[in-house]
Amino acid sequence: MVYSYTEKKRIRKDFGTRPQVLDIPYLLSIQLDSFDKFIEQDPEGQYGLEAAFRSVFPIQSYNGNSELQYVSYRLGEPVFDVKECQIRGVTYSKPLRVKLRLVIFDKDAPAGTVKDIKEQEVYMGEIPLMTDNGTFVINGTERVIVSQLHRSPGVFFDSDKGKTHSSGKVLYNARVIPYRGSWLDFEFDPKDNLYVRIDRRRKLPASIILRALGKSTEEILDIFFEKVNFEVKDQTLLMELVPDRLRGETASFDIESNGKVYVEQGRRVTARHIRQLEKDGVDHIEVPVEYIVGKVASKDYINEATGEIIVNANQEISLEALANLSQAGHKALEVLFTNDLDHGPFMSETLRIDSTVDRISALVEIYRMMRPGEPPTKEAAEALFESLFFSEERYDLSTVGRMKFNSSIGREDAQEQGTLDETDIIEVMKKLIAIRNGKGEVDDIDHLGNRRIRSVGEMAENQFRVGLVRVERAVKERLSLGDLDAVMPQDLINAKPISAAVKEFFGSSQLSQFMDQNNPLSEVTHKRRISALGPGGLTRERAGFEVRDVHVTHYGRLCPIETPEGPNIGLINSLSAFARCNEYGFLETPYRRVVDGVVTDEVDYLSAIEEGQFVIAQANAKLNEDGTFADELITARQKGESGLHPREHAQYMDVATNQVVSIAASLIPFLEHDDANRALMGANMQRQAVPTLKADKPLVGTGIERNVAVDSGVTAVAKRGGVIQSVDASRIVVKVNEEELVPGEAGIDIYNLTKYTRSNQNTCINQRPCVMPGEPVARGDVLADGPSTDLGELALGQNMRIAFMPWNGYNFEDSILVSERVVQEDRFTTIHIQELTCVARDTKLGSEEITADIPNVGESALSKLDESGIVYIGAEVKGGDILVGKVTPKGETQLTPEEKLLRAIFGEKASDVKDTSLRVPNSVSGTIIDVQVFTRDGVEKDKRALEIEQMQLKEAKKDLTEEFQILEGGLLNRVKAVLIEGGYSEAKLDATDRKKWLELTLEDDALQTQLEQLAEQWDELKADFDKKFETKRRKITQGDDLAPGVLKIVKVYLAVKRRIQPGDKMAGRHGNKGVISKINPVEDMPYDEKGQPVDIVLNPLGVPSRMNIGQILEVHLGLAAKGIGDKINQMVKEQQELAKFREFLQKVYDLGDTRQKVDIASLSDDEVRTLIKNLRGGLPIATPVFDGAPEASIKALLELADLPTSGQLTLFDGRTGDAFERPVTVGYMYMLKLNHLVDDKMHARSTGSYSLVTQQPLGGKAQFGGQRFGEMEVWALEAYGAAYTLQEMLTVKSDDVNGRTKMYKNIVDGNHSMEPGMPESFNVLLKEIRSLGINIELEDEE
């Protein structure tokens, strides 16, 4: 295995045994690919903006004299980059410019003669851009558009499973769902008539739609029924016999032919009888006349002589009609073939309840149903029916829909057509009737072949199309009005509706969500989330159990573990590790192909539909060296069922053991030993871990930590290989390798790092370099760690030394006892950054002002403000301190213009303003780390704003100059190389000024050309630098574009350091969560024989009932890993030679039968030293999901570390020094601190705001509310008999308005007594009873 430069620094020992056939694909591709498809110009016009434009344009005027055509579009450059957008609170977007062509036709000349053509580029609003990490910056905040799982367009056959009708009869239905347009439903009623509904409106007999398509009764019967022919011969009836049709019938007469009786009357016809009849070639049999009575005629029979109809099509034949027929000379009769078994008379029955007779009456009936109350005309009815399913503007099945539709009804042609046609409708009805007849199956709507993913690009395109359609109407009207000679395309198009539609989608759609930015994992999983909710999806209330449940087709596509607990369970899913979307939007998962019993490394991606017919072996099937299966019988899946199959039958095999689960679940080591419910909690809680001050890699991981850290985008990753030229806290410079250079560039890559910025969840984002100057790096190497990453690996928590034992009741019911050492070492200290904003507005009474001159505020309160009234950076502030001084005019009266003038001349009166300063919220204290001032264009900047501006300009200049110098240095080094090659001596060059080198000349023409090219590049570089600086300067100095009425915004950033404390929530990765009950002194904690105290004591009773045994194995393996680290430390102390270390490390990495082969001999001495340095804290271990370290390997590793193989140690009580009587399980567990901190939840109220109606205190910390004293609490006080306490709880402490004021007065007067009055909620109750019409009054006791 080849390790990258960063990986070599700390090689993770891998216990996985299955070879890695496929790397985990880029985790954010579902977002990025989809959006690229939307924005990329697609010559076919299938996807994205191009498709939206082509579907709406050209727009023709109503009179047909002109049309507006679409030519092409282009996206401009964004004004601000991502960081600037976040600071300024604007949307990161590109302007969309569309080239349109207005064609005006000559009215007087023949049709199609062009009179005038005008082309122009029109601005059509802004299109938000996706950042490199798959997010959008909307109004300054990072948002994610979650993909939606919705029902695929197509046709679905379903049944009500006998729930609708009381008899329990199963009613079948078919539904045609288009991508856009009206739904078409066919359904049976309990009487077996077939009905149709359009858009879920009232139902009509299904034959109406066929009549509206122009079919007569005869044609309809012809489509749906087989016929039986009868012949009248000398007073007897001969029936044409198709023996197969008799199957299952009871003979109502002797079936005989040529005197031979085949079936006696009253007997049932069996397969044997049919074979006999077929063998003897019987094709006609004689039937009694009564047999035909009650059969249904298949066409009209007319008396040729009189022209009257004897029998109508679809009319039952009676004896009388039979006599009339033979009288009129009809010798042959054709009737419909029906039976109760598999040829029901459904369509014939339906025609009888259909009141319409011809096409027009059917169209009118449909019109009445769709538009009740409007008088129907023939034209309107025809136009409506045409527009419902047959017009491309109104109806589109989409490519997916057509593909699903055709495969469902078995149609081969009409691949591209988006609308329905006659064949489609008839075929759907035929299939539905066939299903009712017992042939065919209903569809499973929860099958992933019937649900598809709608990603960002597709949703944005749909919204964009909605905007265009709104514009289309306006354009049509403008084209039809008056004179077009002076009109340009720009005058026709109003970009407002388009940008409004796009803005609404990105800003407030249910699927556009505020990004979960707790840690890198929560970012990645948020982007990989698949939601069944949202517009066009399900709603929480209506979603039943089936939709939420795990379906067999989820295997390898959606994770069965990771889903939220609560009302959304099963509706919000996560993409599995290897899953991807195909071109139709269906989820696919990869499988290894098995050819002639040999498993190959070729990988095929199969969708849920394709997977059905294959036998797929599991990833843990044992293989021989040559790739054949080792066992005769293997566990495999076919059609979603798991079972044992002979090895010859296998056609595919899973690619990896973690193929089934999502990224978050793949991060749980020993997941295979955890109960699913706990694994779900574990996966969800990792997303809530807060990044700690010093990230600490997990000792026991699963090997995909690196993928998450790198793909999440929080680390700085090398774009190209090279050598590190310089490193400081905020930037890394890489000199690029020669072979990766683009000809004619300076060959320097500069990575600017993010320092101490605020995330969406107020956690701290900070990048730290993890490379040193002179180190070689390759493309994809990690250069800097972000939050929660350590040497390029995800590190959500800390490795803690843990003991499973009770300790004085402090770990009762999942409480956690923590050692004081954890606090001292800042193991779980986190930094939180809050943004507080102060806005100065223009009010009716005059403008608000930001100033240090605040009325009635003492000197000490202003000590942290500068003269502009804004807090200093670095100031330590606590609750209630002023951050930004602001005064607002308060006027009893609005001023007249004259008064305003006098005020302006003679200055303000101090009493006319009130203090509205921005203060630190009550429960917060911390350090000011940054201040930003935004001033409206045209408003004078204050001193602080100018200082900040100067500082930003200085920094920008410094950054750009350094960048320029680095690039210039690279360029001049290449100039020097050329000059030396051309004969100049190095000493002479060093003596000359470097800028003059470019003016020197060379004899060699080729070298002179090279030199001139380099000189040109230098000029370009200089010009580029000047241009960049000018742009930057303009951005910094120009006024800001603020909301209407806002003059100035001051943003203050406050950093809070939170140490761990009782009440904080912590958890492991196995769903083992708890709250800290006590921080115990180190000397009281249990310690082992070496005197090493444990950090955390957990309750052993938290394990058995929860069945998450994975945590115990993790603890054992963690102990061994740490033991190896201790052993290396010991060797370092003894100063053993490097060879010994190499030998020991080789032994460690070779342990167990694993796929990983680490050759320590191939590492250089320096690399081994780095490795030793990084392993001293413990050997990092990977135990992949479902392929983890076996018990034997754990024991072997413990042995290697000289630790007891039981994983248990004798512990001593820290308080008494006595040994505990039993050995205790001690080891290292990876613990997370979750974002449920006691500081954010702790809250107390004295007095505050009250609810308007009930006059009771509000609830919740945000409203500064009170604690609810509910029903059960009242019972408790009743049980104690504490009557007075109860009385004050229900009156003066709650909603007795007069009592509250009296009590306040009494307290002020020093009189500590109370007089309870009437609670306001009692008055509310009285009023509510009165509203029911019952008068109820309180009478005083006199």
Curated annotation (Swiss-Prot):
InterPro entries linked to this entry: DNA-dir_RNA_pol_bsu_ext_1_sf, DNA-dir_RNA_pol_bsu_external_1, DNA-dir_RNA_pol_su2, DNA-dir_RNAP_su2_dom, DNA-dir_RNAP_su2_hyb_sf, RNA_pol_bsu_bac, RNA_pol_bsu_CS, RNA_pol_bsu_protrusion
Subunit structure, as described in the record: The RNAP catalytic core consists of 2 alpha, 1 beta, 1 beta' and 1 omega subunit. When a sigma factor is associated with the core the holoenzyme is formed, which can initiate transcription.
Gene Ontology molecular functions: DNA binding; DNA-directed RNA polymerase activity; ribonucleoside binding
Keywords: DNA-directed RNA polymerase, Nucleotidyltransferase, Transcription, Transferase
Cited function: DNA-dependent RNA polymerase catalyzes the transcription of DNA into RNA using the four ribonucleoside triphosphates as substrates.
Organism in which the protein naturally occurs: Vibrio parahaemolyticus serotype O3:K6 (strain RIMD 2210633)
Name of the protein in its database record: DNA-directed RNA polymerase subunit beta
Known catalytic reactions: RNA(n) + a ribonucleoside 5'-triphosphate = RNA(n+1) + diphosphate
A Gene Ontology term for the protein's cellular component: DNA-directed RNA polymerase complex
Annotated GO biological process: DNA-templated transcription
Pfam families, sorted: RNA_pol_Rpb2_1, RNA_pol_Rpb2_2, RNA_pol_Rpb2_3, RNA_pol_Rpb2_45, RNA_pol_Rpb2_6, RNA_pol_Rpb2_7
SUPFAM superfamilies on file: beta and beta-prime subunits of DNA dependent RNA-polymerase
EC category: transferase
E.C. code: 2.7.7.6
Family: Belongs to the RNA polymerase beta chain family.
